[in-house]
Swiss-Prot record:
Belongs to the UreD family. One of its GO terms (molecular function) is nickel cation binding. Its main location: cytoplasm. The keyword Chaperone applies. It comes from Haloquadratum walsbyi (strain DSM 16790 / HBSQ001). HAMAP family: UreD. Keywords: Chaperone, Cytoplasm, Nickel insertion. The gene is ureD. This is Urease accessory protein UreD.
């Protein structure tokens, strides 16, 4: 099974088939369509975390870093994309390495809007590496799929046993126009996490509405928007985090659930709703509660 880069998950067979379809405009991996962001953050002694190195290729852009987080040692990196949309043949690859004891929050400027496609697909890839004692958050804005869009979204986490990695995502179908719900072609999102090469989580959302309507009881039922939060923290009190998050989500508009990972490696949260604002609020509430348990301070929700 082929891959798009050295770090990515194997490309699913359906997306390999899409990749054989020729594009009339710039080909996949062409100029402006092969975005790369390779970031390394580090920290010395008790000083704040700094961005040690960065390599970016269009359409990724970075103006600088922020130190507005209530956690003094944590750095915030907000990636920008001047193109405003994801189109057929786009391949975007993000790699973040957090050196020992570094604290970082990675996000982006706005939602990833995946446009209508006639061939190929778009791949949004993230590889997160957290070394000993590191704390790394990756919470991008929602991914929005338009009519006939195809999107493969993969996240790989590699971490030390005493590190923490938090990953969040929200998926919104057909948010750019007045199309029928779930008129996109194919959406496949997968998150894998490993602690010293030991797999602790493998989770996927694979939706092909033309083959199977997602609005069934076994998938998402009556809802349309899907949100996920993954908290990988083998050294934490996982049961306590799960209980606090569960209580926080009791009044969520829609449906939400919390599960603990095997070997107490962390928790997963899934939220469903009819509006992106409701699902985003649920994921942010779970993130906020997790932070209070792990860092003793809540999330900077007003700054997002």
């Amino acid at each position: 099974m082929s891959t798009d880069s050295d770090h990515t998950h194997p490309i699913p067979p359906a997306f390999q088939e899409y990749d054989t379809q020729k594009l009339r405009q710039s080909p996949a991996f062409g100029h402006g369509k092969h975005g790369i962001a390779d970031l390394v953050v580090g920290r010395e002694d008790n000083k704040p975390t700094r961005l040690l190195s960065d390599f970016l290729r269009v359409p990724y852009h970075l103006s600088g870093t922020l130190d507005s987080d209530p956690v003094d040692e944590l750095i915030t990196v907000c990636l920008q994309d001047p193109t405003g949309a994801i189109t057929q043949g786009d391949r975007h690859s993000l790699t973040v390495t957090a050196r020992p004891d570094a604290y970082a929050h990675i996000t982006n400027q706005s939602a990833s809007k995946v446009q209508t496609m006639k061939a190929s697909y778009a791949h949004l890839e993230a590889t997160l590496i957290a070394e000993s004692g590191a704390y790394l958050e990756y919470l991008p804005e929602p991914t929005i799929l338009n009519e006939d869009a195809r999107c493969l979204q993969t996240t790989t986490v590699e971490m030390a046993p005493d590190a923490t990695v938090i990953v969040g995502d929200v998926f919104v179908p057909d948010g750019l126009s007045a199309h029928e719900p779930f008129s996109f072609d194919h959406y496949h999102s997968r998150t894998d996490a490993r602690v010293e090469q030991r797999l602790i989580c493998a989770d996927a959302v694979n939706l092909q509405p033309a083959q199977r309507d997602p609005r069934n009881l076994a998938t998402i039922g009556e809802y349309t928007v899907i949100g996920n939060l993954y908290v990988f923290s083998p050294g934490a009190d996982v049961e306590a985090i799960a209980e606090m998050v569960h209580q926080r989500l009791t009044d969520h508009e829609g449906a939400a659930g919390v599960s603990t990972l095997r070997n107490e490696a962390g928790i997963t949260v899934r939220a469903l709703g009819d509006r992106s604002t409701d699902v985003t609020a649920a994921i942010e509430a779970a993130w906020d509660e997790t932070r209070r348990e792990l860092l003793g301070v809540g999330a900077p929700l007003g700054d997002r």
